[in-house]
Regions:
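Non-transmembrane, aqueous-exposed alpha-helical and coiled segments at domain scale
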Residues: 231-581
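A charged, well-structured terminal subsegment
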Residues: 195-226
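Glycine-rich, charge-decorated loop segments at or immediately adjacent to ligand/cofactor-binding or catalytic sites
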Residues: 175-187
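N-terminal secretory signal peptides that target proteins for export/translocation
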Residues: 1-18
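Short beta-strand segments enriched in small/hydrophobic residues
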Residues: 75-87
């Protein structure tokens, strides 16, 4: 039986590419072991493979020493800087209230000045930093129960330390590792004070961090905190592990190098075959700052992870373009957010047909190799090439099923309108990939409903920064036959996705993100996304919720019925795939 099993295994894999042979062997081992009590291979006789290491290499970091500490807080001005607006609960309110009272008791002469960022927590605010440097002897930075806010709070605090102002950052216990990896990446050993989770719940038991905060501001610097120079990053060993298929699976999983699903071992032969899918050199840098930790990424490292995902060489240009788009920096907050965002990848142009992507029936579901592997690969890139790790810097409180694989092609053949890439400034024959962030809210199955129903539903999505309406071909063609262009459909959705100004104004996303923009601040490099007149409108005025430029229509799906889906998606970043062929 054992010999017969080995003969069958060798026969069914004869002449196939190594990647496919490995997958068939893995399936054969599992199925044979499940059906019989006899192992597929004799003990010690299983084939072994050398799997390349999929991990990227963090960049070298310039070490920035902390500013000298104060000797006493009496007669000193200390700024308490809040990342979130005054009327949006951060979770720290009772803690900060007790802290201020404690510091005033401990240092009767202290002058505590409370300041709230005018810009969103993720945006640089040079005017505020200059004021802190000019007026404060020290600062206390207060983030929120938010991974992205904590990361940005540590980032801006590092800048203040570099300007010569000593400080400390509070953080909740659940976000301790998130704060730690951020200060490690920055090379500035910001002093952190941990607060128990939900200590700001208002039950009268807020944590007292007075002594810890005071110590952070007055305790002398350690040698590590005074260190300068460069922290060099040693590249990982080329070979990740040598072992059987099962051993490779177990090892990669234990190292947090997978998404939990089985992978194709990235052997030298498999990776060399994958690299034939692009003319670009293996050592070429695709992006210098892959998220979440800003690592540089080479073409070869993309190929290694592409093999793991089950991709083919023909898909390699799409994956390289996806890395370029994701490494643009627009998604720094979304990728580590506690809000459980996901990322949607849309492929347009001839390459979608060339690699057999599904744009029709079940396009958003399982069953198509290219859709699944391209979608899956992005999550492996985030883990292995961007330094992501669940519970450390990937902090989605509940997670998102779209994080496994959310990739499809537009059904250009069945669409009555120009394809998506044309609306982004490309030609119809250009192949592109567009990456969106969001996926937290969606509505669907809009069978035979008009656009007003869809607009009404999407108006109530949280974080109203963008919307993608996915229209089945029957829906799109019916609208086109009624005389509507794609731009007109987008206009109708934007115009009718409204709330009263009072409803809009009371949402804390409006307070956190939209008010700063209305007051002229930038967000992700953009201004004027909503009219400044919103600031003065009465509560009963009806207003458009979304920025007009962030309402998009894409045609996807089969011909069986007229369906629509609305997805909360924003930050559309479109790049050329053709440049990576």
């Amino acid at each position: 039986m054992r010999g017969a099993g080995q003969s069958v295994a060798r026969f069914v894999t004869l002449g196939l590419p190594l990647g496919l042979r490995l997958l068939l062997l893995l399936c054969f081992v599992v199925v044979t072991s499940a059906k019989t009590s006899t192992p597929a291979f004799a003990a010690g006789d299983e084939p072994k493979y050398q799997a390349l290491n999929p991990r990227g290499n963090p960049p070298d970091v310039s070490l920035v020493p902390l500013s000298p500490r104060l000797t006493d807080l009496n007669d000193k001005t200390v700024f308490v800087v809040h990342a979130w607006p005054a009327n949006v609960p951060s979770g720290f309110e009772p803690v900060v209230e007790r802290l201020i009272a404690g510091l005033k008791t401990k240092y009767p002469g202290i002058n505590l000045v409370t300041r709230y960022k005018d810009a969103a927590y993720s945006e640089d605010e040079p005017e505020l930093w200059t004021q802190v440097k000019r007026e404060a002897a020290a600062f206390i930075y207060v983030p929120a129960d938010s991974a992205a806010t904590t990361m940005w709070s540590v980032t801006w605090s590092a800048g203040l330390e570099k300007m010569g102002v000593p400080g400390v950052v509070l953080h909740f216990a659940a976000l301790a590792e998130n704060a730690e990896v951020t200060r490690t990446k920055l090379g500035t050993p910001i002093r952190l004070v941990e607060v128990p989770n939900h200590s700001g719940s208002g039950d009268g038991n807020a944590a007292d961090v007075t002594d810890a905060v005071a110590a952070a501001l007055v305790s002398p610097l350690t040698d590590a905190e005074r260190a300068t120079g460069t922290r060099h990053s040693e590249p990982p060993p080329r070979i990740g592990v040598t072992g059987t298929l099962a051993e490779i699976q177990d090892f990669f999983y234990a190292q947090h190098w997978t998404d939990g699903l089985p992978i194709i071992p990235p052997t030298e032969e498999n990776v060399a075959a994958m690299l034939k899918g692009t003319k670009h050199a293996a050592s070429e840098i695709v992006t210098k700052a892959m998220l979440p930790e800003g690592w540089p990424v080479t073409v070869e490292k993309v190929a290694i992870n592409a093999v793991m995902a089950g991709a083919t060489p023909n898909e390699m240009p799409v994956l390289l373009a996806a890395i370029e788009a994701f490494g643009s920096g627009h998604f720094a907050s979304s990728v580590r957010s506690t809000n459980s965002f996901s990322f949607m990848q849309l492929v347009n142009g001839p390459i979608a047909r060339e690699i057999g992507m599904n744009s029709g029936t079940y396009a958003l579901g399982p069953g198509n190799r290219a859709n699944a592997t391209i979608g899956r690969a992005l999550r492996l890139f985030i883990y292995n090439l961007g330094g992501g790790e669940n519970g450390v810097n990937l902090m989605g409180t509940q997670g998102n099923v779209g994080s496994y694989a959310f990739c499809f092609a537009e059904n250009e053949a069945a669409s009555p309108w120009e394809p998506f890439q044309v609306s982004r400034g490309f030609e119809r024959d250009d192949s592109t990939i567009t990456v969106f962030a969001g996926g937290w809210s969606h509505t669907g199955n809009m069978l035979h409903q008009d656009l007003h129903r869809l607009a009404r539903d999407i108006a109530y999505f949280q974080w109203p920064s963008g919307i993608v309406a996915l229209l089945a071909p029957a829906t799109a063609n019916a609208l086109a036959q009624s005389g509507m262009s794609k731009a007109k459909v987008e206009e109708e959705l934007w115009r009718n996705a409204t709330l009263t100004m009072g409803e809009f104004r009371n949402d804390h996303y409006y307070q956190r993100f939209i008010i700063p923009i209305l007051k002229g601040k930038e967000m992700n490099g953009l201004r004027d996304r909503w009219p400044a007149s919103y600031l003065n409108l009465p509560d009963d005025a009806r207003v458009q919720v979304y920025p007009r430029d962030d309402v998009h229509v894409v045609v996807v799906g089969g011909e069986a019925n007229a369906m629509m889906q609305g997805w909360a998606m924003w930050g559309a970043t479109t790049v050329s795939i053709d440049k990576w062929r």
